[in-house]
């Protein structure tokens, strides 16, 4: 249900879900309060809730190779749904400086997770296959601040950028392996990440697009390799540990030029480079006894591309 006028807006609602893996109907309420002190400033206060059902996920179907041994994921018999309660407050501001249009968004957020899905310590089920069990953890908190800005100059230049500062922690240290210390930080969640895009059209047929993503340091699990499995491939014996990854800045550029072939037919030639600075993982595991899940960072090394597009 929503009530609004020029300065105020109140939205209250909810959602009912019935999942075949959950016994009861789940009600997820939400609310939003908007206030506009001026025409160009939007202030918002929001609350929402949600859940993840204890179903099979894509990664559950993926069979990993860990130190020369097959590893699989199974669900605990008493696995319950993961629930979230989220709060956010934001200020969205617009202003025009002559031919320049600008927008700045500042948002703070806090999410409380209960019955968090966690993967337990791997064990051998007896047939040479390692099993990691997905169960419910005690809980977690995710909080942070997001800044986003946009600048546009006529139809010639558009720039957009965003930066998020985030803290994500379990309520209690999570023991993910016998050989490794427990960790409170949630794995694969960087404390800092951001992006930017810039598009320039100096002349009508030509467009230049520049884009980049920044990923801060994060913790990634690297599984152990036993002395027995070390003989199977290139990776030496090692203990399991949580690796703190380096920072990554993935920058790409694309140039495109349009040709008029006929009244309503255009031909575009384009080309560019992805990951210009070769910001890429340097310590992949290799060989038959590798940990195939030990992958992080940008998905592609430096790559060149070219294309042709016909539109009519």
Residue locations for each model-derived region?
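Signature of Gram-negative outer-membrane beta-barrel scaffolds
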Residues: 1-38, 42, 53, 64, ...
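Residue-level signature of outer-membrane beta-barrel architecture
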Residues: 1-3, 16, 35-36, 49, ...
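Residues that define the transmembrane beta-barrel architecture of outer-membrane proteins
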Residues: 4, 25-27, 83-87, 139-143, ...
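Gram-negative outer-membrane beta-barrel transporters
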Residues: 4-7, 103-104, 109-112, 133-225, ...
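Repeated loop/turn-to-beta-strand initiation elements of outer-membrane beta-barrel proteins
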Residues: 7-10, 40-43, 97-102, 155-159, ...
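Transmembrane beta-barrel strands of outer-membrane/channel proteins
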Residues: 12-16, 31, 45-49, 58, ...
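Membrane-embedded beta-barrel scaffold of Gram-negative outer-membrane proteins
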Residues: 36, 44, 78-135, 141, ...
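C-terminal beta-signal and adjacent terminal beta-strands/loops
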Residues: 114, 214-230, 257-312
């Amino acid at each position: 249900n929503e009530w609004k006028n020029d300065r105020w807006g109140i939205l209250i609602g909810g959602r009912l879900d019935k999942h075949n893996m959950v016994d009861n109907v789940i009600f997820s309420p939400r609310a939003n309060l908007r206030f506009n002190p001026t025409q160009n400033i939007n202030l918002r206060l929001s609350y929402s809730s949600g859940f993840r059902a204890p179903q099979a996920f894509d990664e559950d179907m993926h069979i990993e190779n860990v130190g020369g041994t097959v590893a699989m994921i199974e669900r605990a018999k008493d696995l319950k749904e993961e629930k979230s309660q989220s709060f956010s407050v934001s200020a969205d501001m617009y202003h025009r400086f002559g031919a320049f249009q600008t927008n700045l968004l500042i948002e703070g957020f806090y999410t409380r997770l209960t019955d968090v899905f966690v993967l337990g310590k791997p064990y051998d089920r007896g047939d040479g296959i390692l099993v990691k069990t997905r169960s419910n953890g005690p809980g977690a908190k995710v909080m942070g601040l997001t800044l986003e800005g946009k600048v546009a100059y006529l139809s010639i230049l558009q720039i957009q950028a965003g930066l998020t500062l985030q803290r994500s922690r379990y309520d209690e240290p999570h023991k993910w392996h016998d050989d490794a210390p427990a960790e409170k930080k949630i794995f694969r969640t960087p404390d800092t990440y951001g992006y930017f895009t810039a598009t320039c059209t100096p002349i009508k047929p030509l467009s230049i697009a520049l884009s980049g993503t920044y990923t801060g340091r994060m913790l990634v699990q690297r599984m152990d390799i036993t002395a027995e499995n070390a003989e199977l491939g290139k990776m030496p014996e090692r203990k399991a540990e949580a690796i703190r990854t380096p920072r990554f800045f993935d920058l790409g550029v694309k140039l495109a030029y349009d040709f008029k072939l006929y009244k309503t037919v255009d031909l575009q030639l384009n080309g560019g480079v992805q990951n210009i600075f070769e910001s890429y993982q340097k310590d992949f595991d290799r060989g038959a006894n590798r940990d195939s899940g030990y992958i992080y960072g940008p998905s592609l090394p430096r790559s060149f591309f070219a294309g042709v597009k016909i539109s009519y």
